[in-house]
Amino acid sequence: MRLRLLVSAGMLLVALSPCLPCRALLSRGSVSGAPRAPQPLNFLQPEQPQQPQPILIRMGEEYFLRLGNLNRSPAARLSPNSTPLTAGRGSRPSHDQAAANFFRVLLQQLQMPQRPLDSSTELAERGAEDALGGHQGALERERRSEEPPISLDLTFHLLREVLEMARAEQLAQQAHSNRKLMEIIGK
């Protein structure tokens, strides 16, 4: 009876003990690129503001990862003197520039009109477009007709393979976490 109680208490302590934060979520130190050591949790001190967590934003069929403060103004544009080309060779654009580019693309996507595919107004617009830029439209249609469409069988085959890979990865992660738990309990 005491052994069961002791094992149960040990399992609860392991399950409810705070774990160290993920290395990717460590806040950056004063030296760029050098992570700070994780701080122990102290429930008696007042909360400190945390860094914002990444947010996944969907635009069409693509996903973008947004890091940073979402309350910051999205209207910030790149100034001509701070373009990535003038920042120096081999250097990356700053986070503010990346955020400005991200929000610029997001606003462009949101401002694009959304209309149904089979509407009569779209057919009329296509006719006007063909009359104005007939040569360009013809080249685009010709290019599309040359590319063979992806068959549904291939699509579903690829989807099945991706799902199997995800399932195998999930099982491997579960086995790894079980192994770690057994090592902790075994000690």
Curated annotation (Swiss-Prot):
Record keywords: Amidation, Cleavage on pair of basic residues, Hormone, Secreted, Signal
GO cellular component, one term: synapse
InterPro entries: Corticotropin-releasing_fac_CS (IPR018446), CRF (IPR000187), Urocortin_CRF (IPR003620)
Pfam families in alphabetical order: CRF
PROSITE patterns: CRF
Highest rank taxon of the organism: Eukaryota
Main localization, broad class: secreted
Biological process per Gene Ontology, one example term: female pregnancy
Keyword NAD assigned: no
Residue segments, region Disordered: 75-95
Family label: Belongs to the sauvagine/corticotropin-releasing factor/urotensin I family.
Oligomeric and partner information: Interacts (via C-terminus) with CRFR1 (via N-terminal extracellular domain).
Name of the protein in its database record: Corticoliberin
